[in-house]
Amino acid sequence: AGVPVCLMHWRTLQEGAFGSAAGSADHGGDVVRDVHETLERLANNALAAGVRSDNIVLDPGLGFAKTPQDNWALLKALPEFLDAEFPMLVGASRKRFLAAIREDRGVESSPLLADPATAAVTAISAQMGAWGVRVHEVDVSRDAVDVAAAWNAGAAYTGGEHASGSYANGADGGT
């Protein structure tokens, strides 16, 4: 089939049940392995159904039935996911585990106040080679990606040129 598809990990407590994205599910003690294996199975199912491999994008499902620790483990393992055959989408925008960064400091927290943390995750994900990111505040995240690109370019950065696209692996930040 010629239609692009994004396959996201979302394990529920009951097979076939769709509920709240909050909370956690049993990932067999290793969320990274569980997400890898599930996304691989989903991709193989899509290929078997006739979806072309160049139309498949994978998403680890940050925040969907995962604890904050699960989400951080998945972000730390992002390079492992990027070694896979398919492009990776990182959807961390305004997730509770990012808002919790502020709570840990004892300051006001809300999903809206997680935009700076979202921008940081966006810039790091783009720098690592993520195919794309899902964000609410495009300008803030775009600035973060462009700052990281300028930083990496150093003296080669010419200020007036668009910085995106300069990362290894050809990522453009997807914002």
For the regions a language model picked out, list residue spans one by one.
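Acidic/histidine-rich catalytic cores of soluble enzymes
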Residues: L62
